[in-house]
Design a protein with these regions (language model features):
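Active-site beta3 strand of CheY-like receiver
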Residues: 47-53
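Receiver (REC) domain active-site loop signature in two-component systems and cognate sites
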Residues: 58
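Short hydrophobic/Thr-rich beta-strand motif most characteristic of the beta2 strand and flanking loop
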Residues: 27-35, 43, 195
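Short, flexible helix-to-coil linker/hinge segments that flank and couple to helix-turn-helix
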Residues: 89-96, 106-153, 157, 210-212
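Active-site residues of response regulator receiver
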Residues: 9, 55, 83
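Acidic catalytic/metal-coordinating carboxylates
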Residues: 36-39, 62-65
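Recognition helix of helix-turn-helix DNA-binding domains
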Residues: 167-200
Length: 214
C-alpha cells in the first residue's frame, strides 16, 4: 500500500507542488490535504496517515500546537515539519512537541523523499540548519548549567527570590539576612552569570527551571 501521507500547508500552490512531485514516487500516496492546524488534527484522526508534512504557520493552531495535539492522541503518526523557518524559536519547540523531522522548503526533492522514508521507518531527519540550532541550544544549556554550579546555595536562594519579583528589602526579610548582604549577593550573581540587571537574572532563573514562571 505504500506510505500514506497528508500535507498540511495553508498555501495551495505549495500543496499542489508537493502532491505533483510525490505522485512520482511509487511508494508514497497522498491521502489528504489540510490548510489549517485544526483541519490537520481532524484529518489525522479520520485518515490515520503514516506521516504528515506539517507547515509551521497556518491559520488557527500553528504547526507546533497541531503536532503536540496529534502526537498526544496518535503517537505512532510520524510528523515532519516542512517550513521556511530555521530559527531556534521554531526548531526547538517543534522537536519538543514531538516532530520526528524538520526540513526547510528549500530542501532538494530527493532529500525530502529520503527524509519521509527514514522517518516512516522510525528514524529522524533534520535539515543541517535545524541540527545547528539544536546543537547551539544544547551548548548554551551546558554553559548555563555550569554558571549555575558556580553559585553558592545562598546565591541560588537570592536568585529565586529575584525571579519572584521581590525587592532587596523583601528578599532580606524572606531569607533573614540584611539588605546590604542581599545587595552583595545580587552583585555576585550578576557577575557570575554574566548578566547586566535583575530582569535578565529573573529570566535566567525561569529559563533554567530554578523557579516556576510567575
Amino acid at each position: 500500500m505504500g506510505i500514506k501521507l497528508i500535507i498540511a500547508d495553508d498555501h495551495p500552490i505549495v500543496r499542489r507542488g508537493l502532491v505533483f512531485f510525490l505522485k512520482t514516487q511509487s511508494d508514497i500516496r497522498v491521502i489528504g490535504e489540510a490548510s489549517s492546524g485544526n483541519e490537520i488534527i481532524q484529518l489525522a484522526d479520520e485518515l490515520q496517515p503514516d506521516l504528515i508534512l506539517m507547515d509551521l504557520l497556518m491559520p488557527g493552531l500553528n504547526g507546533i500546537e497541531a503536532t503536540k495535539k496529534i502526537k498526544a492522541k496518535n503517537p505512532y503518526i510520524r510528523i515532519i515539519i516542512l517550513t521556511s523557518f530555521s530559527d531556534q524559536d521554531q526548531v526547538i519547540p517543534a522537536i519538543e512537541a514531538g516532530a520526528d523531522g524538520y526540513q526547510l522548503k528549500d530542501v532538494e526533492p530527493d532529500v525530502l523523499v529520503q527524509a519521509i522514508r527514514e522517518v516512516v521507518n522510525g528514524g529522524k531527519s533534520l535539515h543541517p540548519k535545524a541540527t545547528d540550532q539544536i546543537v547551539s541550544q544544547f551548548t548554551k544549556k551546558r554553559k548555563e548549567d555550569a554558571k549555575i554550579d558556580e553559585l553558592t546555595t545562598r546565591e541560588k536562594e537570592v536568585l529565586i527570590e529575584i525571579a519572584k519579583g521581590k525587592s532587596n528589602k523583601e528578599i532580606a526579610t524572606s531569607l533573614y539576612i540584611t539588605e546590604k548582604t542581599v545587595k552583595t549577593h545580587v552583585s555576585n550573581i550578576l557577575a557570575k552569570l554574566e548578566l547586566s540587571d535583575r530582569t535578565q537574572a529573573a529570566l535566567f532563573a525561569v529559563r533554567n527551571g530554578l523557579v516556576q514562571n510567575q
